[in-house]
Swiss-Prot record:
<keyword id="KW-1032">Host cell membrane</keyword>
<comment type="function">
    <text>Involved in the intracellular transport and egress of virions to the host cell surface with help of protein OPG056. Also participates in the formation of actin tails at the plasma membrane to allow efficient actin-based motility and thus cell to cell transmission of viral particles. Recruits host intersectin-1/ITSN1 and activates host CDC42 to drive ARP2/3-mediated actin polymerization.</text>
</comment>
<keyword id="KW-0597">Phosphoprotein</keyword>
<dbReference type="InterPro" id="IPR010274">
    <property type="entry name" value="Orthopox_A36R"/>
</dbReference>
<dbReference type="GO" id="GO:0016020">
    <property type="term" value="C:membrane"/>
</dbReference>
<feature type="short sequence motif" description="NPF-motif">
    <location>
        <begin position="189"/>
        <end position="191"/>
    </location>
</feature>
<protein>
    <recommendedName>
        <fullName>Protein OPG164</fullName>
    </recommendedName>
</protein>
<dbReference type="Pfam" id="PF05950">
    <property type="entry name" value="Orthopox_A36R"/>
</dbReference>
<dbReference type="GO" id="GO:0020002">
    <property type="term" value="C:host cell plasma membrane"/>
</dbReference>
<feature type="topological domain" description="Extracellular">
    <location>
        <position position="1"/>
    </location>
</feature>
<keyword id="KW-1043">Host membrane</keyword>
<feature type="short sequence motif" description="NPF-motif">
    <location>
        <begin position="175"/>
        <end position="177"/>
    </location>
</feature>
<feature type="modified residue" description="Phosphotyrosine; by host">
    <location>
        <position position="132"/>
    </location>
</feature>
<feature type="short sequence motif" description="NPF-motif">
    <location>
        <begin position="160"/>
        <end position="162"/>
    </location>
</feature>
<keyword id="KW-0812">Transmembrane</keyword>
<comment type="subunit">
    <text>Interacts with host NCK. Interacts with protein OPG161 (via C-terminus). Interacts with protein OPG056. Interacts (via C-terminus) with host kinesin light chain/KLC1. Interacts with host intersectin-1/ITSN1 and EPS15.</text>
</comment>
<keyword id="KW-1133">Transmembrane helix</keyword>
Length: 216
């Protein structure tokens, strides 16, 4: 009977002691709890960042694989087109020789028609001659005007001061080397000799005198 109250007192005393210890250590326990909480939040952030990086890396790997597959498909298409070009049934395999001089297509067009596209040869069966495009053909019937050797010189542009090209009009008094054709001699001409009044009215003497002076 004595043991029952002793056990009860011991339990109550122990509970009070534990509560007192917890009350004294409450600040330290709170700080530890806060520190642990901060650590847990940091760990969660690190974990989320690692998961996002891993997802991005997987996306990059998938993009790279898609790019490689697209490149392989393009290479396959190029190889198929090259094989079609090099096929014997293509245009290159159907070229033939024309009189062992020119390579032509089966459509009787010259090779320049299909390859170059600019320097084109046109076969004219009527004239039996080859005419190049963008050229001018000159007919033999066309005549070319030749400068006539007997063309009269323009008297307004006479190059010889000693020759009178303008014989219909009176000569200019500024040129002393050209003689006058009439009997009116210029007094300002020093190259003319003095004439008497007897010779002024004689046309024969005037003509002789004029010819002599022109020769001089």
């Amino acid at each position: 009977m004595i043991l029952v109250p002793l056990i009860t007192v011991t339990v109550v005393a122990g509970t009070i002691l534990v509560c007192y210890i917890l009350y004294i250590c409450r600040k330290k326990i709170r700080t530890v709890y806060n520190d642990n909480k901060i650590i847990m939040t940091k760990l969660k952030k690190i974990k989320s960042s690692n998961s996002s990086k891993s997802s991005k890396s997987t996306d990059n790997e998938s993009d790279w694989e898609d790019h490689c597959s697209a490149m392989e498909q393009n290479n396959d298409v190029d190889n198929i087109s090259r094989n079609e070009i090099l096929d014997d049934d293509s245009f290159a395999g159907s070229l033939i020789w024309d009189n062992e001089s020119n390579v032509i297509a089966p459509s009787t067009e010259h090779i320049y028609d299909s390859v170059a596209g600019s320097t084109r040869l046109i076969n004219n069966d009527c004239n039996e001659q080859t005419i190049y495009q963008n050229t001018t053909v000159i007919n033999e019937t066309e005549t070319i005007e030749v400068l006539n050797e007997d063309t009269k010189q323009n008297p307004s542009y006479s190059s010889n001061p000693f020759v009178n090209y303008n014989k219909t009009s009176i000569c200019s008094k500024s040129n002393p080397f050209i003689t006058e054709l009439n009997n009116k001699f210029s007094e300002n001409n020093p190259f003319r000799r003095a004439h008497s009044d007897d010779y002024l009215n004689k046309q024969e003497h005037d003509d002789i005198e004029s010819s002599v002076v022109s020769l001089v």
